[in-house]
């Protein structure tokens, strides 16, 4: 039977600003990537999101990003590998405190936004991020774009890696995501998104913007929790994957 983990970026509210429907989305995912205060989130939101995920039995991962609240961590900022190591380790450590207080374990680490995309193509940054994860806990799973430099770096260092695919994003011919600045970067149609996920899981391919079949590996699929139709999207994805005989379950650290 085909199997997939469903993950979502959560805990991205901060201060007076509320982003996403975290409590509702948690009913439809198996892994939660919780913001650690740099691109979004704050200590109170981190604590509450950890507690919610733990209550619902959803696996928890750190979601470190660039220090860019105004740009939501989606703007590329030039950083050195040393800086990538430091900011990754710092944010994992911050979330870890709340997990320890709640009595639950961290499952994975998934970089956010621009940091994720930069690490996907930059060997130096990807190596630094993988090192930070490994030095914190070599038992953690490193999430990264399927076929990316980040996955390669994690594999080289001996980490368990999870190749990630996206339900609501279009792909380019080289297997990277279409930049959000492009008009067709996001998939708004639920049926098209579901069809893309089923293809990625069952056929290990995705159809690029130009109609080319691109090979990939799908261990976990990301759905975004900050969109206007995020909750409907989450419900539909889970329902249709089950109907397609795809088992939905969290990854194992073993």
From Swiss-Prot:
Keywords: ATP-binding, Hydrolase, Nucleotide-binding. It holds the Pfam family LamB_YcsF. GO terms for biological process: carbohydrate metabolic process. One of its GO terms (molecular function) is ATP binding. The keyword ATP-binding applies. It is an enzyme of class 3 (hydrolase). InterPro entries: Glyco_hydro/deAcase_b/a-brl (IPR011330), LamB/YcsF/PxpA-like (IPR005501). It comes from the Bacteria. Its EC number is 3.5.2.9. It catalyses: 5-oxo-L-proline + ATP + 2 H2O = L-glutamate + ADP + phosphate + H(+). Catalyzes the cleavage of 5-oxoproline to form L-glutamate coupled to the hydrolysis of ATP to ADP and inorganic phosphate. Belongs to the LamB/PxpA family. Forms a complex composed of PxpA, PxpB and PxpC. This is 5-oxoprolinase subunit A. The gene is pxpA.
């Amino acid at each position: 039977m085909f199997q997939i983990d469903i993950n979502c970026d959560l805990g991205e509210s901060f201060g007076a600003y509320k982003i996403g429907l975290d409590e509702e989305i948690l009913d439809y995912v198996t892994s939660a990537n919780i913001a650690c205060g740099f691109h979004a989130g704050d200590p109170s939101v981190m604590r509450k999101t950890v507690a919610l995920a733990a209550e619902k039995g959803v696996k928890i991962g750190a979601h470190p990003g660039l220090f860019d609240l105004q740009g939501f961590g989606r703007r590329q900022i030039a950083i050195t590998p040393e800086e990538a190591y430091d900011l990754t380790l710092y944010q994992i450590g911050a979330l870890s405190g709340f997990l320890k207080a709640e009595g639950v374990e961290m499952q994975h680490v998934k970089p956010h936004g621009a940091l994720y995309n930069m690490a996907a193509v930059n060997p130096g940054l990807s190596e630094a991020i993988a090192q930070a994860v490994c030095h914190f806990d070599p038992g953690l799973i490193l999430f990264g774009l399927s076929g990316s430099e980040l996955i390669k770096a994690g594999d080289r260092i001996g980490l368990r890696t999870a190749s990630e695919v996206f339900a609501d994003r279009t792909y380019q011919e080289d297997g990277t995501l279409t930049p959000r600045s492009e008009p067709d970067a996001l998939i708004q149609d639920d049926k098209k998104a579901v069809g893309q996920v089923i293809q990625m899981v069952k056929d290990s391919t995705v159809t690029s913007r130009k109609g080319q079949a691109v090979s990939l590996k799908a261990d976990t699929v990301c759905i975004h929790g900050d969109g206007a139709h995020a909750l409907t999207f989450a419900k539909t994805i889970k329902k249709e994957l089950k109907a397609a005989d795809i088992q939905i379950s969290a990854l194992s650290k073993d």
